[in-house]
Amino acid sequence: MRKLIAAGLVVVTVALTLVFAQSRALGQAAKSADPIFGRWMMDQTRSVNNRGGDHATFPTQHVRILAPDGDGVRNTLFNSPAAPPQYSYSARFDGKDHPDSRFPGRDQTLAHWHLAPDVIVRQQKTDGKTSEWVIYTVSSDGKVFTSISWAPSNPELQDVQVFTRAN
């Protein structure tokens, strides 16, 4: 079963890469009314940190704020509600590689697509090769935000972060 899931994720990764490569302009402008924007509080009981393969829970309640910023998004992450931001960066929804300001001096880039009012996709590249995919989605009622991320080298090791709207 794990092999099927891993194979499926590889197929999805390849398909997403092809779609994005063929349609760099694909996407939508950021609109403040889009349901994906807001302040989101992690539901630790429904979130799984599996990058190490151990299906661990997150030790603290993360807070993520997604806000429209020009023709893109400002993405801010706090490791707990009382902590200072772990990171905060702005990104354009143009599907192009831009330097990753979270790690100055590294050969790391981020590309973002706003595929629908409730979907954002992020591709991270390190040394020119895709090192992470992230898909952000919001439920149809706008109350639940989910972040699913994985590294192409181990697609079966996914982080699933589930958040509820805080504002």
Regions found by a protein language model. Name each.
Residues 26-167:
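Hydrophobic small-molecule pocket/channel-lining residues, especially in calycin-type beta-barrels
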Residues 6-11, 28:
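Generic secretory/membrane-interface signal
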